[in-house]
Amino acid sequence: MLYIAATFYAVVFWLVALKRPGLALALIFSTAPFQNDLSGGGPVKFSIAEINLLLTVPALLLRAPRFVIGPVAWPVLLYFGVCAASSAMHWRATTIVCFVQMALYLLVAVAMFASLPHDADDLKLSLYGLIGVGVLLALIMTITRSSYVLGLHKNGVGASLSCALIVALEMWFAGEPGTGKRLLAAALAIIGAGLLVSLSRGAWLGALCGVATLLALRRQFGLFLRAALVLVPVILIAWTFLPKESRETATGFDRGRWNIKARYESVEVAREFFQKDPLLGSGVGLRKEYDATNIAWLTLAETGALGLGALALIHLALLRMVWRAQKSVGREDELFSLLAIGAAMVVSRLAHGLVDHYWSRGAIMIAWSSAGMATFAFWEVKRRLAEGEDVSQDEEEAQEPAQSLL
């Protein structure tokens, strides 16, 4: 019966993806927070978003108006080359699984969201879908104050909420005054409260760095202060309702605490493996053998200095792409929002990965799918410029903050 249901779902999804690619993309993006393993205990774990991503591949091959990965392609291939060289010398039982996982995010997700949309409208449902899921998870988290929400650990939920917060803030920035903007303001308040209650400091750091990236690109600090008038009181109220023990746990950095101690132990384990081969590391798959809560040290341990350099190049290539493209579009352009969200998500995920698991399902799918959206926007800007369309905006108009919070 289970196989019949799975087959029926796959067939229906294929039909939807071929007919409405925007809906298929939304089903990938907005279900990413649900990291629950659907493998049934198999050797390879996968979530509903990963299933949807793979089911959309036929639509990518048959219906995509273009097939691009963007400027990150060469750094990604370089990174995979270093990973292959390291793994050839230090093969592990989980090496293939890790390669598949990395390819799924860095190649398939990026290519899917960069290639399949016909226009920016095909991505709107994805963004609003994630905001809706974020509001749902935040409400449950705030009401129950449980360490698990719908079978998801609070750290995973916190990572997803930080992504939803970034998307909601950028959509609020870009929105026209009216009911839609008021709803986004309410969503921001709810998601912000849920993020706080999650007590995930990695998610807090990721959200902070993501928001800082948005501000650096938009340079609309006055408008952000108006948004803070809504967010800060709600966050303070949520904080006062937290139990004293939870507040102490969230603000404590004593090395004697088990969670802080575990982070230091993780770094020491990674350091030992890195010292065995500083150039190429000890092989991909090591992340499955210890509690890898620092992406920099994990990358050094698995692929050495060459791997860390290649991973840094991937992020630099994406940020350079966004910086180049955003100078050619106005801040009210939908393409600007896609560029800003892509950069903010990747920076957020990297910051989070410095203090927690980077390659965990959920937020990483959202981050690199957003990178694909930014790549789509980049190619759209190039197309407009090549066709002589006016994509610029008067500088004073672009920097003029909104007159009202709502």
Which positions does each model-derived feature cover?
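Membrane-interface helix caps and helix-loop-helix hairpins in membrane proteins
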Residues: 40-42, 88-97, 144-152, 196-197, ...
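Long extracytoplasmic/lumenal interhelical loops at the membrane interface
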Residues: 148, 245, 253-306, 324-329
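Short, aromatic-rich membrane-interface segments at the entry and exit
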Residues: 2-6, 21-28, 42-50, 95-100, ...
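N-terminal hydrophobic segments of proteins, predominantly signal-anchor/transmembrane helices
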Residues: 16-100, 104-107, 135-140, 180, ...
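Membrane-embedded alpha-helical segments of multi-pass membrane proteins
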Residues: 2-9, 34-35, 45-62, 100-109, ...
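A membrane-periplasm/extracellular boundary helix in multi-pass inner-membrane enzymes
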Residues: 193-199, 215-258, 266-276, 405
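Transmembrane alpha-helices of multi-pass inner-membrane enzymes
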Residues: 54-58, 339-350, 357-400, 406
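Alpha-helical transmembrane segments of multi-pass inner-membrane proteins
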Residues: 8-16, 80-87, 104-112, 118-219, ...
